[in-house]
Amino acid sequence: MKAQDLREKSVEELNSELLNLLREQFNLRMQAATGQLQQTHTLKAVRRDIARVKTVLTEKAGA
């Protein structure tokens, strides 16, 4: 997910995207805790996507 794509979305779409990413992060953390997660790099990718969405939301709030 690119920041430029996120900047084109509305605040409501960004909030729903953030909610989906947080749910996905929770599920991945549970899989990691139980030893079921095979691709551990997805945790890092989701965490960075969450940061991107939050950054764009902050930019939109300030503008």
From Swiss-Prot:
> GO CC annotation: what is one?
cytosolic large ribosomal subunit
Q: Which Pfam families match?
A: Ribosomal_L29 (PF00831)
Going by the entry's taxonomy, the superkingdom of the source organism is recorded as: Bacteria
Kindly give the CDD domains that the UniProt entry links to this protein: Ribosomal_L29_HIP
Keyword list, A-Z: Ribonucleoprotein, Ribosomal protein
Signal sequence bounds? none
Q: Its Gene Ontology biological processes?
A: translation
State whether keyword Ribonucleoprotein applies. yes
* Annotated GO MF terms: structural constituent of ribosome
Keyword Mitochondrion: yes or no? no
Q: Its family? A: Belongs to the universal ribosomal protein uL29 family.
Q: Which NCBIfam families match?
A: L29
Task: State the name under which the record lists this protein.
Answer: Large ribosomal subunit protein uL29
> What species does this protein belong to?
Vibrio vulnificus (strain YJ016)
Traced from the root, the source organism's taxonomic lineage reads: Bacteria, Pseudomonadati, Pseudomonadota, Gammaproteobacteria, Vibrionales
Which gene is transcribed and translated to give this protein?
Answer: rpmC
